[in-house]
């Protein structure tokens, strides 16, 4: 079964009301004639209203960068799945290394978020990946397996049906370093194989994106790899022209 690629922009802590409208207008113009690739953007939650309005009559889906576990009540500062759905959000990034590092989110906590999203009918985009020290120690596969197992051991392999995994080597995020296509493919193949131990069918369907300094210059070569099903894009998603090159490269390589 052919997997439809997904390219998603993670804006991180960037933007303004005007920037949101301007960037989405640019993306709609750039991607107007592109087919064969799903596209999503995850602006800061503050700008979901502007993004939702700007995305009207567009095939670009709306995502966000985090969610909390509680649906409502006395949880100051939290954001619920129901609130996100109110803005038409489809995809939710969880487990990003910046959340793991700066907010001390554990594999177990992230697995709970995964379950909350599945229960709400939203699509989890589960970020996994190793640090530079772990990579140099040959622990890449061990780390990725542990982060996937946190979900599989509590929710079962079927939880990955309709979900997205983003492999983001931490040493490549925002550093300008990127895994080579062969390096990335090897890890993606391992991830798919690890899930296949539980269910071949789920493994064949799950979308596995690459993230980590992916840009308009290296995207096309990465997408030639059979187990790379798209990208979770950071800095390059803040420029319509650069992001569009990545989307077009995915559409061309996978169709």
From Swiss-Prot:
Keywords: Cytoplasm, Gluconeogenesis, Glycolysis, Isomerase. It comes from the Bacteria. GO terms for biological process: gluconeogenesis; glyceraldehyde-3-phosphate biosynthetic process; glycerol catabolic process; glycolytic process. The active site is at 96 (electrophile), 168 (proton acceptor). Transmembrane segments: none annotated. Signal peptide: none annotated. Disulfide bonds: none annotated. Substrate binds at residues 10-12, 174, 213, 234-235. The keyword Calcium does not apply. The keyword Transcription regulation does not apply. GO terms for molecular function: triose-phosphate isomerase activity. PROSITE patterns: TIM_1, TIM_2. Pathway: Carbohydrate biosynthesis; gluconeogenesis; Carbohydrate degradation; glycolysis; D-glyceraldehyde 3-phosphate from glycerone phosphate: step 1/1. It catalyses: D-glyceraldehyde 3-phosphate = dihydroxyacetone phosphate. It is found in: Cytoplasm. GO terms for cellular component: cytosol. It is an enzyme of class 5 (isomerase). Its EC number is 5.3.1.1. Belongs to the triosephosphate isomerase family. Homodimer. NCBIfam families: tim. Involved in the gluconeogenesis. Catalyzes stereospecifically the conversion of dihydroxyacetone phosphate (DHAP) to D-glyceraldehyde-3-phosphate (G3P). This is Triosephosphate isomerase. The lineage of its organism: Bacteria, Pseudomonadati, Pseudomonadota, Gammaproteobacteria, Pasteurellales. The gene is tpiA.
